């Protein structure tokens, strides 16, 4: 990673931790909910988010929702996080294979991408069922890199109430995980949704996260041109254009459903519900 980017993305771990923990507390109070439910996958994003949630409130519940495509190491690391958070009485293990098989059989598909999205959406349904039972919010685990790239399932892992690490790039999440004292194996593990066997984020995207984060930061935080990024990072312009395109074509994933404006007070375009009523 270019030294300028490394310095720019370096975070004050204590300050970031304190800020996010306080914001979680505030948002739970504002939402009039008792706590948060979270899915833990064994990856760094869910591990960091679960740790921050546990620091914010004692009222948290963890769901482990493996499938046949979940690597054993991910399930092992999920249980490692249960121990790390002393949450032996605050979790539930639910294998989703039978539910996913029922869905895929009904729609008569063996397409791995469709089935992968079904898996993500089944997990969302389970999270919200537990959230309703417990009167909790669903706490999402997406980071800024994934959100910008659209590397999540709409109404799947993207279907949540709050995204505590949504303004941290993947490399920053790893920094924070290290500062929080998470197991090294989890902090450094290659990211993967594990929606099918052998899937890795970097393999699917074709670019490593250090390069992705460098491009995203320069392009969308500093508003640099493609040519400037190519010159600074010394990478082919095709890679910069690919990242740029992924952000543009996934914009619909980051927005609420489009409402076609007919009146002078259309929701979202003319009238927005305030975060807090005065």
Curated annotation (Swiss-Prot):
Positions with a binding annotation for Mg(2+): 45, 146
Pathway info: Cofactor biosynthesis; NAD(+) biosynthesis; NAD(+) from deamido-NAD(+) (ammonia route): step 1/1
Top enzyme class: ligase
Superkingdom, natural source: Archaea
Molecular function terms from GO: ATP binding; glutaminase activity; metal ion binding; NAD+ synthase (glutamine-hydrolyzing) activity; NAD+ synthase activity
GO biological-process terms attached to the record: NAD biosynthetic process
Transmembrane segments: none
Record-level GO cellular component terms: cytoplasm
Function: Catalyzes the ATP-dependent amidation of deamido-NAD to form NAD. Uses ammonia as a nitrogen source.
Similarity annotation: Belongs to the NAD synthetase family.
Assembly mode: Homodimer.
Identification of the protein by name: NH(3)-dependent NAD(+) synthetase
Organism: Saccharolobus solfataricus (strain ATCC 35092 / DSM 1617 / JCM 11322 / P2) (Sulfolobus solfataricus)
